[in-house]
């Protein structure tokens, strides 16, 4: 078990669907065209930006998705080479591109669709919660760049942390808890 478990709280009522988080992550990680480490969905609709209700009473709810950095990650358990790893010091799940063979087992195993295959480099890629930034004392780019301040980052395993308190206060829930992976990203 990790000493810490970094995670995130996403307050969907504050997300305006601008995709700054998606684009910033894509640029920071120098992803090739078509490979994204996060995405945005419109809750309740297959097509993004569709609204509920009729004018003047309309609403739309966006849900940003990223790797859930699960306490029991299916991608790690199913990786045949050990390339997908969970860092013990903070619970971040990441890919070792030197060990990854690009087989896609992690992509199929993840119930959240977090890993993607980088066809150019022939490796699996995914959100690493901006681990290099975090190790320098900075927040993940998706957190600090969000104009709606929809995301909160921290150690979800520390009951005294701001994020753990916010999760408790808001009644936030992870996605697909029935999968048994114990995700570390919560939504309210």
Language model: regions and residue ranges:
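Non-ligating segments of multi-cofactor redox enzymes
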Residues: 1-188
